[in-house]
From Swiss-Prot:
Gene, per the UniProt record: ybdM
UniProt xrefs under SUPFAM superfamilies: ParB/Sulfiredoxin
Source domain of life: Bacteria
Species annotation: Escherichia coli (strain K12)
Protein name: Uncharacterized protein YbdM
GO biological process, one term: cellular response to oxygen levels
SMART domains: ParB
């Protein structure tokens, strides 16, 4: 009985989707995926619900310290063009019609800029949503970048400065960004802002004799 109902639902759903114009079909698929996500055993995992959205809805964040060298970016483009998108772009909602990129800026740039990909993907890109406060989104971006071994020191120090000014202490910064206390202190010192480390003593390694 259950298998028969499932087969009938699957068949009806397939026929319904096939009858829709393409943009309406994509919208319907997204809505169905979100409905399934609500009852999924894996609904706590962002990748459980990958949606297709217009690339014009995505915008970069203003804090990403990641940088990809031209050869790596060229290889990334070749990989996406040949193998397809194997990783969605991680985003957060900023308003009803816009999403801010948490991770995947270069995938977005390539997907939006490559003529062959624009044609193949019909102006859409795959995204998965990660919600949270600005502090949490910054930390998520840094974790993604550091896990791949890529981040710019100066930009990273700016992130530490902002998180410190938003009320995060050294322990929380280190825990959320995967740094030890010395690394947090050094990144603060790069900015040359005394107030950021006024409550800390200098490490002996930084003492000039």
């Amino acid at each position: 009985m259950g298998d028969t109902m499932q087969q009938r639902l699957t068949q009806d759903l397939t026929q319904f989707l096939a009858s829709l114009p393409e943009d309406d079909r994509i919208k319907a698929i997204n809505e169905i995926r979100m409905a399934i996500h609500q009852v999924s055993p894996f609904r706590e995992e962002p990748v459980d619900c990958v949606l297709w959205v217009k690339n014009s809805q995505l915008m970069p964040n203003d804090y990403n310290p990641n940088n990809v060298a031209p050869p790596e970016k060229k290889l990334l483009q070749k990989s996406i063009e040949i193998d397809g998108f194997t990783q969605p772009i991680v985003v957060t909602h900023t308003d009803k019609n816009a999403m801010e990129i948490v991770d995947g800026f270069h995938r977005h740039e390539i997907g939006k800029g490559s003529s062959s990909l624009k044609l193949r993907l019909k102006g859409y890109l795959p995204v998965t949503c990660l919600e949270g406060t600005r502090n949490q989104r910054i930390a998520a971006t840094i974790r993604h970048n550091r896990a791949r071994g890529r981040h710019q020191i100066t930009a990273m120090s700016e992130i530490v400065r902002e998180l410190s000014q938003l009320g995060w202490d050294d322990n929380k910064i280190g825990k959320e960004l995967g740094m030890d206390s010395d690394e947090v202190l050094r990144l603060k010192q790069i900015n040359g802002l005394q107030e950021l480390f006024a409550d800390r003593q200098y490490s002996r390694a930084w003492t000039v004799k």
